[in-house]
């Protein structure tokens, strides 16, 4: 689907991510620039943008460059923000209003021209509020022709932290956790419950889909399956965005992470990536 106007395509977790406040601060900043959310796949970027648009604007329009190739032609041909907005309004069937409509560009790494166009929104149409998001943006950010240097705000989005995890999985316990004052003694019953919740967090992690599954089913096997699928998605992305030359070494580095973290020595060991491995073999892949 090319766009969506109001409804969320799927509910990840009915809870407030801390990053929502960062988005509110961005909206209220008089020197606001188009905002680019950076982060790995499935950390909740799309959910955040739509939730923000739904609750803090009169309307939002959503465009996904990964789902509709024809959308890219608008940015390949046009550089004028007003013309782009006219065409986007025709596509979504809604008038895009300055300050009242949040414009969302998702998977923007699939259209470097759209990423570059953000500088024209900053220069010529900054009254329009634009948020873009993408995964593996590093390769584009390293290319000055694709990246609008100094013309966008950047915000890194990460998996849910323990506070967000607790808020989603046990609101009552979170209320207690949030009320704890510095150096306050924690009652044993709550200490044990918080410790159990933290142990669950270490196993489940902070990926929103995993947390949502845990909230709905409390089934470790379901969570483990989702985790395996996410790892597979990441591994497939390596070859998609970095080319065949580097993808093999990137994959080797990625698969060595658990072994690296398990070592008592905190220094990264290239030999754990591949027997006889040297820095010059994997430095580029790590970067």
Predicted segments with their positions:
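Interdomain hinge/linker elements that couple catalytic modules in large macromolecular machines
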Residues: 2-11, 167-287
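Short glycine-rich substrate-engagement loop in P-loop NTPases that contacts/grips substrate
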Residues: 67-99
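Structural recognition of the conserved hydrophobic beta-strand(s) that form the central parallel beta-sheet
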Residues: 104, 129-135, 156
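N-terminal pre-Walker A segment at the start of P-loop NTPase domains
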Residues: 1-28
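Short regulatory helix/loop adjacent to the ATP-binding pocket of P-loop NTPases
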Residues: 138-154, 166-171
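Conserved lysine of the Walker
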Residues: 45
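Conserved catalytic segments around the Walker B and adjacent sensor/switch elements
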Residues: 56-71
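Hydrophobic positions on the alpha1 helix immediately C-terminal to the Walker A/P-loop
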Residues: 48, 52
């Amino acid at each position: 689907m090319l766009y969506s106007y109001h409804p969320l395509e799927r509910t990840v977790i009915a809870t407030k991510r801390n990053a929502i406040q960062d988005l509110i601060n961005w909206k209220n900043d008089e020197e606001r620039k188009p905002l680019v959310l950076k982060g790995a796949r499935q950390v909740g970027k799309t959910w955040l943008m739509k939730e923000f648009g739904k609750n803090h604007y009169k309307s939002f329009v959503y465009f996904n460059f990964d789902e509709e190739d024809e959308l890219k032609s608008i940015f390949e041909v046009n550089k004028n923000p007003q013309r782009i907005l006219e065409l986007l309004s025709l596509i979504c069937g809604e008038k895009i209003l300055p300050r009242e409509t949040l414009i969302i560009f998702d998977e923007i790494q699939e259209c470097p021209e759209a990423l570059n166009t953000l500088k024209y929104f900053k220069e010529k149409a900054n009254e329009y509020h634009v948020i873009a998001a993408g995964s593996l943006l590093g390769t584009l950010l390293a290319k000055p022709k694709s990246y609008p240097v100094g013309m966008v705000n950047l915000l890194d989005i990460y998996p849910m932290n323990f506070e967000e995890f607790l808020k989603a999985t046990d609101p009552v316990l979170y209320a207690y956790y949030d009320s704890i004052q510095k150096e306050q003694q924690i009652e044993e019953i709550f200490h044990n419950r918080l410790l159990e919740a933290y142990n669950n967090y270490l196993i489940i992690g902070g990926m929103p889909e995993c947390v949502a599954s845990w909230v709905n089913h409390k089934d470790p096997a379901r969570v483990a399956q989702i985790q395996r699928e996410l790892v597979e998605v990441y591994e497939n992305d390596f070859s998609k965005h970095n080319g065949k030359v580097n993808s093999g070494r990137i994959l080797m580095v990625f698969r060595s992470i658990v072994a690296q973290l398990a070592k008592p020595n905190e220094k990264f060991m290239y030999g754990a990536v591949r027997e006889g491995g040297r820095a010059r073999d994997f430095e580029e892949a790590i970067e």
